[in-house]
């Protein structure tokens, strides 16, 4: 389905962009020979001049921090030393490279919004030197050095040269929804470690929703005793997590979603309700419709107390109050609320929400915080100091900035959509057409069941522009990790390494490097794994439980599969709440959102078709493995019923690989005449084009039939390109 500008612009554009990169490589503009080690960094630095030589190989390194280092600086150096020793198997004896840090850093410097995070690194044959003006700047430099380090038979080394770096945007965040699925403290700590390594600096915790309220409240204990359903963070947990993040240059922003998405709070304290709520389990419509009553003063008294208690736990000056997806059904059905609206002269539920937002702004401000809200909070009378977080479309970024608000961009950065890193990376915060529904697409939604979920705010306005002053109000962005389908075991792999693509977009200048993103992410993925992230290990463990036998055979197939995209695997949302509960342990759940090996194959096909015939053997080996794997995989099915959802994917991969091998042979030897292509292959191509189309955008993912097992053939673009090129 067309009409939603999202995943990509189609097969021709995807292959064309890859071919363009390939052509640039062939003609010497970029490529393995000329690319600097800095070109493979994530995020890419502002300026880097590296010679191609490296420091002499050594057995170890020694860091010399500033003489007046505070506890944060000392902890940063200690983490760097630990990570380096673990990643490169370094000891404490032998010849050493010296790493000297020059920083007259005040304790706590660089943590605030807009404070200096810049640094410079100079690497000579005799030493590495870091210069920064803040403690956080030193952390960013150490993250860069960790990625640049290399160990071979000669020993540990770094590339010679100079780097000067600073972020493009001040706000570079990751939002994690801990309400839908509770995420343990150690899981959040792993994400903070990864954020430090990729230079993200804001962890936004979505702490309450209709499913649960997740923080201990001593003033209103039923919120966590009843509303958490047994899983919550104690106040001591929160304080430890805030300290843990601060040591790593990460600020934590709390979000308590109000007035909608509040069923758990209402269930704990029914006096908050606009309408009575049933006992759980709650259907999807009940969760969507529940909303706090904004007309009663006792509601604001409770919220004032609660916000005062919560702001004391989170020292950051920002406090998020949610404000998204308030449908107003309960307000419209309530006679007392209707009378209140008439008294105040409010004509719509949006007017009442604007009133609530104004009251919340007063409460948050009295507690010394700056309020943040999702873009539904935008209203003519909204105080200008409220930060707006755009999510419905890129248009809302421009409208909020035009209205005088500072903006955090999440439109297009939804990790739960399971879109590839290239999708995330191409969404620029300043591009007001980057994400959203086209006007034509909006017309197609009218009259469908989706119409009640879609409004004009989701629609792109191609005429909208920002002035330089308005662009200056864009603080940055946040990758958003909503967890309806994400258990703690799935958290790392659903976020990483794709979140590094968002980190790169928010830190680096556009087109800062021409080294392919998938190649850069493969490298950073290894660094994240060595630092303790479980984005590789957890999917492997889940796959192992699905089938305890078949190791290499199963792995060969699964590297070619990805889960369907957007909302296609969310059976509850697709069915309007009528689908049975999901297990979160099916084959699609055990797959990472993106197969980097398959994406690499697609890129290599584009490079080959652009003229790099040296890749023929690499492609032939991969295609042969995929073709020959199917017989062994089909033999496993009788003993491993959990794999049945992948049966057709395996056979289709084998057939397409065979056709691609034949095409590759003809491309290599033009004397081989192309015969008439098997009609069954053409039909197979059409089938998988339909599978792709069903995941092409959010709207399609709701309404189109999905492939068996909710899985896609990730190398399909490359397979199709070879088949078509070979005649």
Question: What do the predicted segments below correspond to?
Answer:
Residues 33-170, 371-374, 378, 382, ...:
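Acidic, contiguous N-terminal accessory segments
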Residues 19-29:
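Bacterial N-terminal signal peptides
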Residues 1-14:
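N-terminal secretory signal peptides that target proteins for export/translocation
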Residues 41-44, 48-51, 55-59, 66, ...:
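Substrate-binding groove of N-acetylhexosamine-processing glycoside hydrolases
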Residues 112-320, 334, 359, 363, ...:
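Feature activates predominantly on carbohydrate-active enzymes
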Residues 86, 200, 250, 369, ...:
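Short glycine/serine/threonine/alanine-rich loop segments
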Residues 324-339, 343-346:
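N-terminal leader/propeptide and maturation segments of large enzyme subunits in energy/redox metabolism
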């Amino acid at each position: 389905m067309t009409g939603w500008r999202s995943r990509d612009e189609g097969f021709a554009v995807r292959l064309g962009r890859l071919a363009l990169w390939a052509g640039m490589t062939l003609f010497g503009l970029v490529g393995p020979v000329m690319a600097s080690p800095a070109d493979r960094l994530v995020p890419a630095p502002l300026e880097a001049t590296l010679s191609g030589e490296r420091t002499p190989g050594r057995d170890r390194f020694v860091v010399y921090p500033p003489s007046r280092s505070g506890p944060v600086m000392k902890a940063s150096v200690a983490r760097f030393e630990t990570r380096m020793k673990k990643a490169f198997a370094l000891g404490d004896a032998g010849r050493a490279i010296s790493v000297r840090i020059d920083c007259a850093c005040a304790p706590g410097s660089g943590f605030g919004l807009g404070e200096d995070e810049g640094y410079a690194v100079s690497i000579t044959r005799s030493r590495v030197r870091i210069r920064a003006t803040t403690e956080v700047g030193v952390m960013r430099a150490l993250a860069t050095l960790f990625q640049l380090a290399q160990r071979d038979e000669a020993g540990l080394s770094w590339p010679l040269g100079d780097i000067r770096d600073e972020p493009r945007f001040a706000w570079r965040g990751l939002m994690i929804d801990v309400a839908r699925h509770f995420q343990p403290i150690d899981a959040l700590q792993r994400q903070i470690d990864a954020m430090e390594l990729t230079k993200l600096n804001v962890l936004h915790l979505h702490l309450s929703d209709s499913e649960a309220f997740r923080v201990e409240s001593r003033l209103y204990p039923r919120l966590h005793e009843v509303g958490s359903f047994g899983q919550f963070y104690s106040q001591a947990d929160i304080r430890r997590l805030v300290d843990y993040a601060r040591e790593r240059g990460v600020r934590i922003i709390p979000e308590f979603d109000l007035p909608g998405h509040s069923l758990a709070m209402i269930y704990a304290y029914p006096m908050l309700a606009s309408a009575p709520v049933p006992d759980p389990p709650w259907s999807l419509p009940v969760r969507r419709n529940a909303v706090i009553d904004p007309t009663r003063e006792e509601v604001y008294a409770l919220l004032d107390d609660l916000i005062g208690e919560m702001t004391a736990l989170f020292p950051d000056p920002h406090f998020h109050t949610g404000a998204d997806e308030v449908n107003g059904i309960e307000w419209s059905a309530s006679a007392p609320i209707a009378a209140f609206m008439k008294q105040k002269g409010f004509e719509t539920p949006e007017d009442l929400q604007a009133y609530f937002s104004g009251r919340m702004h007063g409460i948050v401000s009295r507690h010394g915080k700056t309020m943040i809200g999702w873009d539904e909070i935008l209203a003519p009378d909204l105080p200008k100091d409220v930060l707006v977080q755009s999510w419905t479309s890129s248009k809302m970024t421009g409208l909020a900035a035009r209205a005088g608000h500072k903006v955090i961009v999440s439109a297009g950065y939804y990790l739960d959509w399971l879109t590839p890193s290239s999708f995330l990376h191409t969404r620029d915060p300043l591009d007001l057409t980057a994400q959203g529904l086209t006007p034509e697409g909006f017309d197609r939604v009218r009259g469908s069941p989706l119409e009640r979920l879609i409004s004009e705010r989701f629609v792109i306005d191609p005429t909208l522009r920002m002035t330089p002053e308005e662009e200056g109000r864009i603080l940055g962005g946040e990758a958003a990790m909503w967890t309806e389908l994400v258990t703690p075991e799935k958290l790392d792999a659903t976020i990483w390494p794709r979140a590094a693509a968002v980190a790169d977009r928010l830190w680096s200048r556009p087109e800062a490097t021409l080294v392919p993103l998938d190649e850069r992410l493969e490298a950073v993925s290894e660094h994240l794994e060595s630092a303790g992230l479980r984005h590789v290990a957890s999917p492997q463990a889940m796959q192992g439980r699905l089938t305890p036998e078949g190791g290499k055979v199963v792995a060969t197939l699964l590297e070619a599969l990805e889960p369907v995209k957007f909302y296609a695997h969310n059976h509850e949302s697709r069915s309007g709440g009528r689908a049975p509960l999901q297990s979160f342990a099916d084959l699609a759940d055990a797959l990472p959102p993106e197969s980097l090996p398959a994406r690499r194959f697609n890129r290599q096909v584009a490079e080959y078709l652009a003229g790099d015939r040296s890749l023929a053997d690499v492609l032939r080996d991969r295609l042969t493995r995929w073709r020959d794997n199917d017989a062994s995989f089909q033999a496993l099915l009788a003993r491993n019923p959990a794999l049945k959802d992948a049966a057709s994917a395996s056979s289709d991969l084998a057939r397409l690989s065979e056709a691609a091998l034949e095409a590759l042979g003809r491309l290599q030897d033009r004397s081989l005449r192309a015969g008439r292509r098997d009609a069954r292959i053409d039909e197979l191509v059409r089938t998988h084009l339909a599978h792709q189309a069903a995941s092409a955008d959010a709207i399609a993912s709701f309404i189109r039939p999905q492939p068996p097992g909710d899985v896609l053939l990730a190398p399909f673009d490359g397979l199709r390109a070879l088949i078509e090129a070979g005649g």
